[in-house]
Amino acid sequence: MERTKERSSFRKKFIGDRKFYMMVLAVAVPIMIQNGITNFVSLLDNIMIGWIGTEQMSGASIVNQLIFVYNLCIFGGVSGAGIFTAQYFGQKDHEGVRQTFRYKFWMAVILTIGTILLFFTVGENLISMYLQGEGTAQQIADTLKYGKQYLDIMLLGLPPFMMVQIYSSTLRECGETVLPMKAGVVAICVNLLFNYLLIYGVFFFPRLGVRGAAIATVLSRYVEAAIVIGWTHRHTEKNAFAKGLYSTLKVPANLTKKILVKGTPLLFNETLWASAMAMLTQCYSIRGLNVVASLNISNTINNVFNIVFIALGDSVAIIVGQLLGAGDMKKARDTDNKMIAFSVMCCTCVAMVMFVMAPLFPMLYNTNAEARELAKYLIMITAFFMPQNAFLHATYFTLRSGGKTIITFLFDSVFIWCVSVPIAFVLSRYTGIHVLVIYACVQLADLIKCVIGFVLVKKGVWLQNIVSS
């Protein structure tokens, strides 16, 4: 009898009905599709470059790791305001949404200008940080050359990327997830087509190698920006915030202060987290250029599978954030419990598929056998820890939806710099432990975060409306 009651209680707390899952999937699936297609095309892009040569692939992958830091800076910069956007939309306060949009604009402009200046001045030195491991002088010189070629062109794509993130994040926070997905699909098709034409020099197009890949990416970003911006302003009946959006670019001082208080830790968090990921890759790269190549392969494959827990985490921020903005705390907690459980269950299934297929993916690349073998085991290790990452991602966005950005800052970037990076740094430089063991130790350390996240979510420290005043 008691077991029956326990099962009933468990189902009520963690399992939703069909209507609940349809609601969650309505938000999550478009994000999954957009991110999935993006990452799948990144995979194809990666394979296309990889077929030219290992040095070209490694050079482009190092630059993409550096640009990833910028991408997350933008994500962190707009996400701080996004907490307010979701709650303003929950209150149907369209002027509040406009003001948060304007804040996002200025924050993104500042970050983009700073990033372009940084890469123009010390870009070559940053690439060289990843070329200190084993490898011939010629291999290192070629990797640096191709990386610099790729970087110089990719910088032209930062402004449209910035605008896409500002508009798409605002649309999603207002419940419109389909249009950003459609724009992403079109951009991806453009990217894939011109990758093929420009990397290999098909028809009358020149054979540009890594430069062709960069040009295709930049072109696709301008196409995506044109679609998202154009659609938003043509459909003001659906996007009420777009009416009079640029009548002024001023942001009220009191709102700026509130967003900075909540959003600055989030910006620092994303920036420090992304730079920590770049540092982890640099630590692994000490073990040689084959490790750089294998990490590029495994990370590209991992990103295709990670879309599930990333999209479900984003859905937590949107759905729970709107419930908090509407003041329905009881429903917010109940919804959050079910969404976390759903994310972990989904990712357990995905991880099984990923683990079984891990030996097949590296075979797609034209690289040496050692790099392929390393990539296979890196993918397997990541698959094993995917349910853990799903739980962490969902709890992170739960805390963030309630404005607990200081906690997420400590929970995320402070942890990775104080625990994960030191583990990788010490083990890679001062021991003879195999790089796969180092990689697994870094993943295992995140169990500490699981415990912290579980306690904080259960205590309900995130249950608050931050825009009611």
Where would I find each of the regions flagged by the language model?
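Short alpha-helical transmembrane segments in multi-pass integral membrane proteins
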Residues: M1-A28, T85-G157, R207-G263, V320-F385, ...
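Generic alpha-helical transmembrane segments of integral inner-membrane proteins
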Residues: M32, G36, F40, L44, ...
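Hydrophobic/aromatic residues within transmembrane alpha-helices of membrane transport systems
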Residues: I33, D45-I49, A60, T85-G90, ...
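Helix-terminus/linker motif at the lipid-water interface of multi-pass membrane proteins
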Residues: G36, F40-S58, I127-A141, I199-L208, ...
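Transmembrane helical elements of multi-pass membrane transporters/channels
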Residues: A26-D45, I153, A187, S220-E224, ...
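Small-residue-rich hydrophobic transmembrane alpha-helices
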Residues: M57-L117, F161-P180, T281, V292-A358, ...
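Short runs within selected transmembrane alpha-helices of multi-pass transporters and secretion channels
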Residues: V78, I153-R172, P180-I188, A213-I229, ...
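Small-residue hotspots at the loop-to-helix junctions and early N-terminal turns
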Residues: T54-Q65, G147, L151, A214, ...
